[in-house]
């Protein structure tokens, strides 16, 4: 049973005479007037039909309607930890919905002194039948990256109402932070157009140059395979790690070059010719330092971004390579992607950081490694992962960690079509991706 009681003074339960009943009526009137003027907490409800509840009275946070903090001129629904590290509760309302309708949920919030907003602040949608019985899995709309200029975050996602559903219970939750406060505003669940499939065609190449005389010879070999991939109209092609070094007599330092530089120019001309994006592993020289770098080339042939490998094996350190210091995501015309390189896949933090930043596909130029790690990174972050390698498998992995298609020595180019708008539902869990960062261990437990 959920606790949905306010913080107002409550009258005695019974009286045995007329005067007592009269006094009770006066007391009730006084309390109601007091609550209306001083606080909206008394019944946990206000004019827009929002209520408040907590799993247990003992863990209920402070909750109130705040007219001093507004969203587009309207009062906000506030929740505060009030010194309780274990505080947990939510505003809620139930609304009628039509089966098969497409509805877009949106709620906005502004938070202060909240340690982990993704974990402590979220919305949940519970589907119900006509009697109010829960149907299927709850939904956890995504918190969009970034904030508005005035500091508001947005929770937003589009849903199709399941066929047997007639009601939706919407919850706006704050939990597990003693010192924080959140204000919710502008919450809506409105009819929308059905989403179009968001199709991306992803290519990976499996090729290891041997007895190559130069970096340029390597590039020519890879360019022939890119041309072969282009026949299948991919949106993006993934190439392997250190592609200008492998098979030559060069070392990390002698194979390094500026980025942008001659290789990005060479690859850019190809990308522009075939109207595709390209991910490629190179060795970058920047002043006195050399990095193991993956570049992203856009359809116009421009350098759209680069990632310097953060997790270096000792062998690369001994060879004079310097580690990078950040994980970045990049927006393309089909979605948001992240880049990792080889040894990064050994450590969960790399892929987890990219997923937390909104990456939908992670590209992995890799010399060689354990395929189980690639599968794990895809599963635990609910992303697609694309590897291009010499000594592991070059493949596209889905959100279950399954190989959708593999490139081999005999068939070095594969192209896979992915719908980034397709929801993956897991037995007993539902949409795991939407739950991951709501239920992830807190940083203070890890550190």
Mark where each language-model region is:
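Active-site catalytic loop in hydrolytic enzyme cores
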Residues: 285-357, 372, 376, 380, ...
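Bacterial N-terminal signal peptides that target proteins for export
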Residues: 8-28
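Cys-nucleophile CN-hydrolase/nitrilase-fold catalytic domain and related Cys-dependent amidase chemistry
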Residues: 216-220, 225-299, 352, 368-373, ...
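C-terminal beta-strand edge segments of enzyme domains
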Residues: 150-158, 329, 388-447
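Bacterial N-terminal signal peptides
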Residues: 25-37
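Extracellular and organelle-lumenal recognition/adhesion modules and their flexible linkers in secreted
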Residues: 41-198
């Amino acid at each position: 049973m959920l606790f949905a009681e306010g913080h107002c003074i409550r009258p005695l339960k019974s009286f045995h005479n007329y005067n007592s009943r009269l006094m009770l009526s006066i007391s009730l009137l006084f309390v109601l007037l007091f609550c209306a003027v001083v606080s909206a907490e008394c019944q946990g409800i206000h004019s827009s039909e929002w209520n408040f509840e907590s799993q247990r009275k003992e863990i209920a946070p402070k909750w109130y309607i705040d007219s001093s903090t507004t969203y587009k001129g309207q009062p906000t629904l506030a929740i505060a930890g009030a010194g309780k590290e274990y505080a947990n509760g939510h505003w809620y309302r139930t609304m009628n919905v039509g089966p098969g309708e497409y509805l877009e949920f949106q709620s906005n919030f502004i938070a202060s002194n909240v340690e982990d907003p993704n974990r402590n602040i979220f919305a949940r949608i519970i589907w119900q039948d006509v009697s109010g019985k829960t149907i299927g899995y709850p939904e956890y709309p995504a918190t969009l990256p970034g904030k508005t200029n005035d500091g508001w975050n947005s929770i937003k996602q589009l849903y199709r109402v399941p066929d047997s559903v007639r009601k939706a219970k919407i919850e706006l939750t704050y939990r597990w932070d003693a010192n924080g406060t959140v204000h919710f505003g502008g919450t809506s669940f409105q009819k929308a157009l059905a989403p179009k499939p968001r199709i991306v065609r992803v290519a990976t190449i499996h090729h290891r140059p041997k007895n190559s005389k130069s970096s340029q010879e390597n590039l020519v070999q890879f360019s022939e395979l890119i041309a072969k991939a282009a026949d299948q109209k991919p949106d993006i092609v993934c190439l392997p790690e250190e592609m200008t070094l492998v098979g030559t007599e060069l070392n990390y330092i002698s194979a390094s070059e500026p980025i942008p530089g001659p290789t990005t120019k060479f690859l850019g001309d190809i990308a522009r010719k075939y109207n595709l994006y390209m991910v490629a592993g190179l060795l970058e020289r920047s002043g006195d330092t050399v990095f193991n770098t993956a570049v992203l080339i856009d359809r116009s042939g421009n350098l759209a971004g680069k990632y310097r490998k953060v997790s270096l094996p000792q062998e690369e350190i001994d060879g004079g390579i310097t580690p990078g210091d950040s994980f970045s995501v990049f927006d393309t015309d089909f979605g948001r992607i992240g880049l990792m390189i080889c040894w990064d896949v050994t450590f969960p933090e790399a892929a987890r950081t990219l997923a937390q930043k909104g990456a939908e596909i992670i590209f992995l130029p890799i010399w060689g490694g354990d395929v189980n790690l690639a599968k794990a990174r895809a599963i635990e972050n609910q992303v697609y992962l694309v590897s291009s390698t010499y000594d592991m498998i070059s493949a596209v992995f889905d959100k279950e960690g399954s190989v959708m298609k593999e490139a081999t020595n005999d068939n070095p180019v594969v192209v896979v079509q992915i719908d980034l708008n397709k929801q993956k539902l897991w037995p007993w869990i539902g949409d795991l991706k939407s739950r991951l960062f709501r239920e992830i261990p807190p940083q203070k437990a890890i550190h």
